[in-house]
């Protein structure tokens, strides 16, 4: 909607970490707006439940990448270099495709309530509600797999189920017996960091240094940093989250062997700065750094201690020995 920041007042936004929902309440021109935002724990899907008499539309804007070292990665000035279109549509859903250069990805959007969908620009899609209360879900996919129709309440329920299990199954810090006046704030920050790391650093590849919040190092990740982001999962009793990422090492094993061979070594030399493909990023020094080398040994050992069985040894033996 075409609203200036000055029109938005009385902002009250709370992250409920136990249920995985953000509760937002604010006013636009003095009229109240409430929004519940959740993320599906098993799919690349976000949901929003909106209630306001203003019937505010929601816009989906798609940027071109900046290619910069560190920024939000969004270039809004190159509209002609990419295109967004509606691939298919149903009674309460659409499938959008966004194509930039040789890359295409898809966004499945579903909604509940009386809503008008429309393309409002070359790279902008809008949902305009006709009722005070409505909701929508949006799911990212690298392929057109069809619309997965999940309503917002289902997403919020799945998020609540996941986070309830997360907090009950793992460890947390408790500084309630500490006499230092800083203890309560330190405990809050440590627990919040557990949530943030689980949200941003437990994917199918090692995370970039800024997680998902910001774009750093051209969006690439650095293997020397995976220990800092993910070792704590196993120590807090969430070894399953660490186990999500480590299979990536196996997928790039042939490339790591090539690096070692090129440099005159046996075994593997893990890439320092890379991306999901495992290809080394250009660098004057990166290829010769070794601080990323021992991490797979340490992290595999953490998984073995959490699950002391032959399956873990068999899964990671080659990577550990070749490292």
Language model features with spans:
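Acidic/polar, glycine-enriched structural segments that form the non-catalytic walls/loops
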Residues: 1-220, 239, 249-257
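Helix-terminus loop motifs that line ligand-binding clefts
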Residues: 197, 201-224, 237-298, 304-319, ...
